[in-house]
Amino acid sequence: MIYSLLLSALPLLSSAALTYRGADISSLLIEEDAGISYKNLNGETQALEDILVNNGVNSIRQRVWVDPSDGSYDLDYNLKLAKRVQAAGMSIYLDLHLSDTWADPSDQTTPTGWSTTDIDTLTWQLYNYTLDVCNTFAENDIDIEIVSIGNEISSGLLWPLGKTSNYDNIAKLLHSGAWGVKDSNQATTPKIMIHLDNGWDWEEQEYFYKTVLATGSLLSTDFDLMGVSYYPFYSSEATLSALQTSLTNMQSNYDKSVVVVETNWPVSCPDPEYSFPSDLSSIPFSAAGQEEFLEKLAEVVEGVTDGLGIYYWEPAWVDNAALGSSCADNLMVDIDTDEVLESVTVFEDL
C-alpha cells in the first residue's frame, strides 16, 4: 500500500511547476550568420531551439524592433525565428521595444516616422503597429502566447511624449497598444504584459502601477501579466527576499500574474562592479551556480500566487558573453566550443 502511494506521488514530484520555463534567444539568427553552430551536451551540432526544448525550455522570448538600420530584430527577422520556435514546440513571447533600437530605462527613443509631438497621433500609430505585428504573425500561422507593450518601461516609453512627466500619456499608450493586440486576428488573444526593471524594488513597481492606473486611461482589464527584470549583479539590494516581497505585493495589490522575464547568473565574474546580494553570496560563479540560482529563483516565483515563470536572457549570445554586465560571462554556452553547459538541464526541474 505504501509502495503504491509512493509510486502515485512520483509524477507530481518530478513535474515542472512553472508555466513558463523560458529563454530569450533573440540573437540566434545573427549568431548563426556569424558562423556559430551550437552543440548539445553530447558535443553534437544541433539547432539551438531543439537543444533547449530537449532540456525543458517551453517558451521563447523574442525582442522586436520597429525599423532597425540593418534589419536586426525587425518583424521579418522575428517571423523567421518564430517559425523555428513554433516548429520545435515552444510558445512565443514577443517583447516589443517600440523603438528602432534598444529600449530600456535609459533610452526609449520613438521609432522613425512616429509622432513626437502629438499624443493622439502616437497612440493611433502604436495601436496600428501592435495590430499589424499580431496580424502578420497570424497570417503566417504563428500563435503568440505573450506580447509585452514596451521593454523595461519604469521611465516611460516612446519618448518624449511617453516620459514619466506625463503618466496620462503613458497610460494612453499602454491602453492603445494593448487594444491593438486584442483586436488582432490571433486565434487566441495573446496575454498582454507590462514589463518593468528592478523587479526586487517594490517601491518602484508600486509607484509606477499606482500612478499609471490612477489616470483612468489605462484599465486593469487592459493587461494580464506583470513582467519584471531581475539581475543580481546590479545592486546588493536585489535579494531574493526583496524580490519575493515585491512579487507578492504586486500580485496581491493588482491581481495579476507575475513573471520574471529577464535574469542571468555568471559562470565568470572576476571583477563585479557591484556587490552581490547577501542571500546569493554563497552561490558559485559556474554552471552549477547557474542551476542553483535558477532553482532558488524558481522557488520564489512558485511561492507567489500566480507566479508563472522565468525567462533566462540570451543564454547563447556567444559574441556578447557579458550581456551588458560587469561579469565576464553569463552564458549557458561555452564561448570557446559553442557547446551548451550542463546548467541548461535545470529547466527540466523548474
Swiss-Prot record:
Q: Give its E.C. classification number.
A: 3.2.1.89
Question: What functional role does this protein have?
Answer: Endogalactanase involved in the degradation of plant cell wall polysaccharides, and more particularly of hairy regions of pectin.
Protein name (Swiss-Prot/TrEMBL): Probable arabinogalactan endo-beta-1,4-galactanase A
Entry's localization field: Secreted
**Major location (coarse):** secreted
Going by the UniProt record, its keywords in alphabetical order are: Carbohydrate metabolism, Cell wall biogenesis/degradation, Glycoprotein, Glycosidase, Hydrolase, Polysaccharide degradation, Secreted, Signal
Organism (species):
Aspergillus niger (strain ATCC MYA-4892 / CBS 513.88 / FGSC A1513)
The chemistry this enzyme catalyses reads: The enzyme specifically hydrolyzes (1->4)-beta-D-galactosidic linkages in type I arabinogalactans
Give a GO molecular function annotation for the protein: arabinogalactan endo-1,4-beta-galactosidase activity
Concerning its family, UniProt says: Belongs to the glycosyl hydrolase 53 family.
